[in-house]
């Protein structure tokens, strides 16, 4: 068979490549490489060494028979005494932890309520016994209390006593007449020129520089309420937290130790302190209310803490407190209170407290309420039920509670504002403007000073009602038509670890410009006028490390203070 031309060419290429390889001597090189590679030598076998056995002691049973152990069935006197002391110590510890969350009974000196850095009473034994009711204290225990009162000097209270003495001196210098200019109405018209001047004035306000804000820890836990005392020369800031502690900071106090702020922490309550206020005609008194159901007065002159009122559920057989959510004072003697259950109560502080009939304002928690400073019979309430309501206390009847699931009496309802989510707070100023905010991320300003739609709020009769729908359901029968003058977008989503944001008016602005403050979640304060125009955004990013959620303006001066979740305070001056 003859080969094709292509096959012939392929055979020639093969022969030519072989000849080329032979000339290069690659075959011999390959053989030499294979000869130079040594064969691996077998590894020497090593003798295995056995691990030394560790001698283990037999495990003894956790419980052994006394008979096998050779001991007697009865303990010695020393063992009995030691066991009894341990049991008493454990019982005392449990009792103290339980009593920490209960309210105080009776009157105390402020020095007795001082706590240490761990939040424990420095006069712990005295408070533990005093929290028991008088009829449960034995004669021997009363003698022990008297001895402990005599031995108070042995406890180191020098620093706390120094702060309280400064507060006492401060209280002695207060008179109601000193605040006449503050109390009388200061109404003045202003235009954009005044607005610009105010913004420039607030631009000069700076964070307090005498101490680092991280050192101004005024309470043990998250701050839930704060108050700025009306004094201007010797300023005082008071704050309460979630566990009943109340801290007092003498801002301008000076002493031998200038390395730390002058702060004293007390514990007058067993649960969260909901509100702190100073009555206008009694500047030496500080009122506090708590979820433990009590309202107490701190007297800066006498340095005493006394119980003003205590609310309990009338439908419960045992002593079941009604948590007080907010308080306000009308006409210097009338104390108004709201509860976590939606109740309202009035009490004349000139007479001994005896709980009377509770009024029904909401079926859910009232988070905040405010009195019209121009008409004490009118109040506004903000509730968890997503409404803000206006009431007339002159007209109280069971018929007025037609909207409620309960049969309690209610005041006359003027009108209602409905929100998408719960309303956190409401506040009333001297120009008949309301401000409220809630979890719908808005701040609403209402003008009730008289317009074409609504007459002046102080002229409303005791049966006045705004327009309402034809009543087919309970909700339709409630008067509505309360529209906001201004609606401001504001982030109010505080979450679990930050206190609820609440907008508050300045009580008696010395400059005549009505303004309110609300904390900003970006660690700042926002201040607006009553037309909803922002005046300033107070912040210090380098030194403010937390949200000053609970905020307040000084009653007259343009100073702002706020408390954080860690118990620290930020002051702009």
From Swiss-Prot:
<dbReference type="GO" id="GO:0034399">
    <property type="term" value="C:nuclear periphery"/>
</dbReference>
<feature type="coiled-coil region">
    <location>
        <begin position="72"/>
        <end position="152"/>
    </location>
</feature>
<feature type="repeat" description="WD 1">
    <location>
        <begin position="218"/>
        <end position="259"/>
    </location>
</feature>
<comment type="similarity">
    <text>Belongs to the WD repeat DDB2/WDR76 family.</text>
</comment>
<keyword id="KW-0227">DNA damage</keyword>
<dbReference type="GO" id="GO:0003677">
    <property type="term" value="F:DNA binding"/>
</dbReference>
<dbReference type="InterPro" id="IPR019775">
    <property type="entry name" value="WD40_repeat_CS"/>
</dbReference>
<feature type="repeat" description="WD 2">
    <location>
        <begin position="268"/>
        <end position="308"/>
    </location>
</feature>
<feature type="repeat" description="WD 4">
    <location>
        <begin position="361"/>
        <end position="401"/>
    </location>
</feature>
<feature type="repeat" description="WD 5">
    <location>
        <begin position="418"/>
        <end position="456"/>
    </location>
</feature>
<feature type="repeat" description="WD 6">
    <location>
        <begin position="495"/>
        <end position="538"/>
    </location>
</feature>
<dbReference type="GO" id="GO:0006974">
    <property type="term" value="P:DNA damage response"/>
</dbReference>
<protein>
    <recommendedName>
        <fullName>DNA damage-binding protein CMR1</fullName>
    </recommendedName>
</protein>
<comment type="function">
    <text>DNA-binding protein that binds to both single- and double-stranded DNA. Binds preferentially to UV-damaged DNA. May be involved in DNA-metabolic processes.</text>
</comment>
<keyword id="KW-0677">Repeat</keyword>
<keyword id="KW-0175">Coiled coil</keyword>
<dbReference type="InterPro" id="IPR036322">
    <property type="entry name" value="WD40_repeat_dom_sf"/>
</dbReference>
<feature type="region of interest" description="Disordered">
    <location>
        <begin position="27"/>
        <end position="94"/>
    </location>
</feature>
<dbReference type="Pfam" id="PF00400">
    <property type="entry name" value="WD40"/>
</dbReference>
<keyword id="KW-0238">DNA-binding</keyword>
<dbReference type="InterPro" id="IPR050853">
    <property type="entry name" value="WD_repeat_DNA-damage-binding"/>
</dbReference>
<dbReference type="GO" id="GO:0005737">
    <property type="term" value="C:cytoplasm"/>
</dbReference>
<dbReference type="InterPro" id="IPR001680">
    <property type="entry name" value="WD40_rpt"/>
</dbReference>
<dbReference type="InterPro" id="IPR015943">
    <property type="entry name" value="WD40/YVTN_repeat-like_dom_sf"/>
</dbReference>
<feature type="repeat" description="WD 3">
    <location>
        <begin position="319"/>
        <end position="357"/>
    </location>
</feature>
<feature type="repeat" description="WD 7">
    <location>
        <begin position="542"/>
        <end position="573"/>
    </location>
</feature>
<dbReference type="GO" id="GO:2000001">
    <property type="term" value="P:regulation of DNA damage checkpoint"/>
</dbReference>
<feature type="compositionally biased region" description="Basic and acidic residues">
    <location>
        <begin position="79"/>
        <end position="94"/>
    </location>
</feature>
<dbReference type="GO" id="GO:0000785">
    <property type="term" value="C:chromatin"/>
</dbReference>
<keyword id="KW-0853">WD repeat</keyword>
């Amino acid at each position: 068979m003859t080969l094709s031309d292509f096959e012939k060419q392929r055979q020639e290429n093969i022969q030519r490549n072989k000849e080329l390889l032979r000339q290069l001597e690659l075959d011999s090189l390959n053989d030499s490489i294979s000869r130079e590679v040594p064969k691996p030598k077998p590894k020497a076998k090593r003798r295995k060494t056995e691990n030394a056995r560790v001698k283990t002691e037999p495990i003894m049973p956790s419980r052994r028979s006394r008979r096998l152990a050779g001991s007697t069935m009865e303990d010695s006197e020393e063992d009995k005494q030691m066991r009894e002391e341990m049991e008493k110590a454990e019982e005392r510890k449990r009792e103290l932890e339980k009593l920490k969350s209960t309210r105080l009974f009776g009157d105390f000196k402020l020095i007795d309520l001082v706590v240490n850095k761990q939040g424990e009473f420095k006069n712990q034994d005295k408070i533990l016994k005093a929290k028991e009711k008088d009829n449960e204290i034995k004669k021997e225990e009363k003698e022990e209390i008297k001895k402990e009162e005599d031995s108070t000097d042995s406890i180191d209270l020098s620093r706390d006593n120094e702060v309280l003495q400064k507060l006492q001196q401060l209280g002695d210098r207060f008179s109601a007449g000193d605040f006449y200019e503050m109390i009388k109405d200061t109404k003045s018209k202003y235009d954009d020129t005044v607005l610009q001047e105010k913004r420039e004035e607030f631009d000069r306000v700076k964070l307090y520089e005498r101490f680092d804000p991280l050192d101004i820890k005024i309470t043990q836990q998250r701050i839930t309420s704060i108050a700025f005392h009306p004094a201007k020369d010797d300023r005082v800031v008071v704050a309460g937290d979630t566990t009943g502690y109340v801290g007092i900071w003498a801002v301008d106090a000076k002493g031998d130790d200038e390395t730390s702020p002058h702060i004293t922490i007390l514990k007058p309550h067993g649960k969260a302190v909901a509100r702190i206020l100073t009555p206008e005609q009694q500047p030496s008194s500080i009122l506090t209310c708590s979820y433990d159901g009590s309202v107490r007065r701190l007297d800066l002159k006498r340095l005493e803490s006394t119980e003003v009122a205590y609310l309990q559920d009338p439908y419960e057989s045992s002593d079941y407190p009604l948590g007080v959510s907010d308080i306000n004072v009308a006409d210097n003697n009338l104390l108004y209170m709201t509860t976590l259950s939606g109740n309202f109560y009035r009490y004349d502080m000139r007479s001994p407290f005896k709980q009377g009939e509770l009024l029904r304002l909401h079926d859910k928690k009232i988070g905040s309420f405010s009195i019209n400073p121009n008409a004490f019979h009118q109040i506004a309430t903000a509730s968890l039920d997503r409404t803000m309501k206006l009431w007339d206390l002159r007209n109280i009847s069971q018929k007025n509670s037609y909207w409620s699931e309960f049969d309690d009496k209610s005041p006359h309802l003027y009108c209602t504002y409905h929100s998408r989510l719960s309303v956190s707070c409401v506040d009333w100023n001297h120009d008949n403007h309301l401000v409220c905010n809630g979890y719908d991320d808005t701040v609403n300003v209402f003008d009730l000073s008289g317009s074409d739609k609504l007459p002046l709020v102080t002229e409303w009769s005791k049966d006045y009602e705004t327009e309402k729908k034809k009543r087919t359901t309970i909700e339709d029968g409630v008067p509505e038509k309360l529209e906001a003058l201004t609606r401001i977008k504001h982030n109010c989503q505080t979450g679990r670890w930050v206190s609820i944001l609440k907008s508050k008016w300045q009580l008696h602005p010395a400059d005549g410009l009505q303004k309110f403050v609300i904390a900003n979640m970006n660690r700042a304060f926002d201040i607006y006028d009553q037309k909803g125009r922002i005046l300033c955004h107070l912040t210090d990013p380098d030194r403010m490390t937390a949200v000053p959620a609970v905020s307040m303006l000084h009653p007259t001066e343009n100073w702002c203070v706020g408390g954080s979740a860690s118990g620290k305070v930020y002051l702009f001056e």
